[in-house]
């Protein structure tokens, strides 16, 4: 296990409103509209952050039965070789699902990249609150455009032809033997510029309600 090296972790953990729940003793039964129901009680939450183990890029999402509009399942949308997202952060048809390191985000210094994605998501949530919106999702056509960019910059990349967790190959998972395009390799700097342009332009690529 990696030690928490950031400042403030233990201080945050020891706050009076923080509880450690042993899910081996009190297994999670289901996710509810208010939070998480274990075998013992329901824990009401404002935000739920998933940590589901390591199965590169899409595995953590596949393990959860994430359903969008009309009962669409995210893992069904992503079962082909080209999962579609917008910036690797949002999907069309799955309102308010803001991802960190989803398919087609940039690759590079991962902790730094996570920080930038979280900044993007926080700014988006702040924008929604200021404008009185309660729901956001990617426009389908914008997700398709982003996928086209991702595929284009990956065409001549040698590493994209090698079976590894970064290309979606996992020998331990049935049906996960095909190479897939799962990352944006146009550069972390360029990715951040694109994300900033989206924010500065008022998030025209997204649909709000």
What are these regions (language model features)?
Residues 12, 16-39:
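A conserved short coil-to-beta-strand element within the FAD-binding core of flavoproteins
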Residues 37-47, 51:
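Core beta-strand elements of the Rossmann-like FAD/NAD(P) dinucleotide-binding domain
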Residues 1, 27-30, 56-58, 106-108:
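Flexible loop/turn segments at secondary-structure boundaries
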Residues 55-103, 114:
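Glycine-rich loop(s) and the adjacent beta-strand/alpha-helix scaffold that form part
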Residues 19-21, 49, 95-98:
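Hydrophobic/aromatic beta-strand patches that form the interior of the parallel beta-sheet core
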Residues 1-8:
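Short beta-strand to alpha-helix junction loop
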Residues 49, 53, 119-120:
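C-terminal, active-site-flanking charged/polar segments
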Residues 84-85, 96-209:
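C-terminal, flexible cofactor-proximal segment of oxidoreductases
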């Amino acid at each position: 296990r990696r030690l928490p090296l950031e400042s403030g972790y233990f201080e945050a953990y020891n706050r009076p409103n923080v509880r450690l729940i042993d899910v081996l003793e009190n297994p999670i039964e289901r996710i509810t509209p208010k939070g998480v129901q274990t075998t013992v009680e329901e824990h009401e939450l404002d935000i739920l952050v998933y940590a589901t183990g390591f199965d590169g890029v899409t595995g953590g999402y596949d393990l959860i039965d994430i359903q969008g509009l009309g009962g669409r399942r995210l893992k069904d949308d992503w079962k082909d070789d080209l999962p579609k997202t917008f910036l690797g952060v949002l999907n069309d048809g799955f309102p308010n699902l803001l991802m960190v390191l989803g398919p087609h985000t940039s690759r590079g210094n991962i902790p730094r990249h996570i920080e930038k994605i979280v900044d993007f998501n926080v700014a988006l949530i702040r924008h929604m609150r200021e404008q009185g919106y309660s729901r956001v999702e990617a426009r389908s056509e914008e997700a398709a455009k982003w996928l086209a960019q991702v595929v284009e910059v990956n065409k001549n990349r040698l590493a994209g032809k090698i079976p590894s967790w970064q290309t979606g190959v996992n020998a331990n998972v049935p049906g996960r033997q095909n190479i897939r395009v799962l990352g944006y390799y146009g550069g972390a700097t360029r990715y951040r510029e694109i994300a900033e342009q989206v924010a500065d332009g008022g998030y025209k690529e997204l649909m709000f309600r």
